[in-house]
Amino acid sequence: MNMPLLLLIAIVVVSLSHGNGEQTDLTRETFPAGFVFGTASSAYQVEGNALQYGRGPCIWDTFLMQPGVTPDNSTANVTVDEYHRYMDDVDNMVRVGFDAYRFSISWSRIFPSGLGKINKDGVDYYHRLIDYMLANNIIPYVVLYHYDLPQVLHDQYKGWLHPRIVRDFVRFADFCFKTYGHKVKNWFTINEPRMMANHGYGDGFFPPGRCTGCQPGGNSATEPYIAAHNLLLSHAAAVRTYRDKYQAIQKGKIGILLDFVWYEPLTDKEEDHAAAHRAREFTLGWYLHPITYGHYPETMQNAVKERLPNFTREQSEMIKGSADYIAINHYTTYYVSHHVNKTSISYLNDWDVKISYERNGVPIGKQAYSNWLYVVPWGIYKAVMHVKEKYKDPIIIIGENGIDQPGNETLPGALYDFFRIQYFDQYLHELKRAIKDGARVTGYFAWSLLDNFEWRLGFTSKFGIVYVDRSTFTRYPKDSTRWFRKMIKSEV
């Protein structure tokens, strides 16, 4: 008997005797009929084969060439090799009982040069993935853009800082609609545009690493707003293309994924309530207000003034109503209080808030492995109800929700993720409460399927419900997958 098989037997035996407290009163039947349970990933984090099979470089490939960008100096050149092992991953979804898989298409795998010559290997890969999903009754939810701009477009015209990006993104989107739209009925244009605008152009934490004082250059007072403006226009123009050319025939839907931390006032002071309002407007409202009402929030207009770009009348009309559903990526909640910091002008300082993780010495919630993530289940209820009440009661999808563990945990201990089971159970209870109170939530995607490459944290942080042995790429489902199976399939 070989060692991998012996290890697998040991894991199964220990797991069965581990007593992981998986009981829950949640079942599929406690959610509305047709509610979609799924899991999620992104191309850059799971595919690997970064410069193989015709794929061109993206801005993350270039960014990660610098030593020390990730704590473990890891890259996503190989990551968890879903490019070759997508069948294993879909099979695991089927075993759990998931209805859907949210994944992204790598722009530079389809168009290595941003546009122009098509990479047939890349096109064929996504056909294989989608076809295998459909053959196994897993619904594709496809994201067109998840952080991974083709490097050539940044080199040519600074990417999201230039209006030309709108035209190029629409051409890429149009190709995807035309090529996959007869099989894909659920689209998202862009994942977390705020994160790209802030980290790519505000503090330099993400590629292209631009900010005031950053080595590549930049202006933290203006560039985040310019990038966000072009991201919004790209989203809206892609939605218009889909609706004008494809939606009536393909009968699909299209939306956007927006990150949303819930911001709770630190005290009952009026100024802290105003600070929490500003924080929500400068994050979710930055994108969802234009999509709902056709213009930026007045809070931002008053604070940012001439640094905030304006929409033309035509652009405003194009953006307003440019989503069939809104996906919210929600993980955590913070306290905020009023605080003016004018030592420098930047997107983050424009909020005039201070973020806190405790009140009167009491933490807002238990901290996960990541120092930004606290377990605050009631935050998802407030976040969802805020979207319902402020943005005309849209159809809502929870696009991401999850918690991480240290990346150095190994087998079999890494499989015993009771803390993750507790997180999912508590957050789903609060989500169910929001649905009961009238929120039109139609789906929930757990982040993430796999222990994959976690951006600036490399492999030191793991959000997956499936452990991946990176020496063999063997997948080992964690206890949380069994919890989901019992909940979704209503098993005793």
UniProtKB/Swiss-Prot annotation:
A beta-D-glucoside binds at Q45, H146, N191, E192, Y331, E400, W447, E454, W455, F463. Keywords: Disulfide bond, Glycoprotein, Glycosidase, Hydrolase, Signal. Transmembrane segments: none annotated. The active site is at E192, E400. Residues 1-21 form the signal peptide. GO terms for molecular function: beta-D-fucosidase activity; beta-galactosidase activity; beta-glucosidase activity. It comes from the Eukaryota. GO terms for biological process: carbohydrate metabolic process. It catalyses: Hydrolysis of terminal, non-reducing beta-D-glucosyl residues with release of beta-D-glucose. Disulfide bonds join C211-C214. Its EC number is 3.2.1.21. Glycans are attached at N73, N77, N310, N341, N408. Belongs to the glycosyl hydrolase 1 family. This is Beta-glucosidase 38. It comes from Oryza sativa subsp. japonica (Rice). The lineage of its organism: Eukaryota, Viridiplantae, Streptophyta, Embryophyta, Tracheophyta. The gene is BGLU38.
